[in-house]
Amino acid sequence: MTMTDPIADMLTRLRNANQAYHDRVTMPYSKIKANIAEVLKSEGYISTWLVEEPEESAVGKRLVVELKYGQSRERSLAGIKRVSKPGLRVYAKSGELPRVLGGLGVAIISTSQGLLTDRQARKRSVGGEVLAFVW
């Protein structure tokens, strides 16, 4: 069965695992998901991520994301929201890039220079597709 929106699936898996205080979450691998995981890691929302090669019975590669919690299990990932969807794409020019919670959160932008945060895209003066908000 094909998935209509694999990015939304990834974000939902992360949100659900975070709400249930799971230490790790696995999902089907793709390059865009690995790039999103790298952005989340660089911004401090997750501990680490890795790619598991398939076993003999498995179908394809898996992306494993290690979630990050504070000293008394406070969530570092308070919220995550998909913005641009397959049915309604959302694009923003460099001067119109959204700020998430007044700069406390991060918008993940798909640009011609790869996936960037809203701050990085503003600094490089590039716009693109607004994939998600994370706070």
Swiss-Prot record:
It comes from the Bacteria. Keywords: Ribonucleoprotein, Ribosomal protein, RNA-binding, rRNA-binding. GO terms for biological process: translation. One of its GO terms (cellular component) is ribosome. One of its GO terms (molecular function) is rRNA binding. Pfam families: Ribosomal_S8. PANTHER family: 40S RIBOSOMAL PROTEIN S15A. One of the primary rRNA binding proteins, it binds directly to 16S rRNA central domain where it helps coordinate assembly of the platform of the 30S subunit. Belongs to the universal ribosomal protein uS8 family. Part of the 30S ribosomal subunit. Contacts proteins S5 and S12. This is Small ribosomal subunit protein uS8.
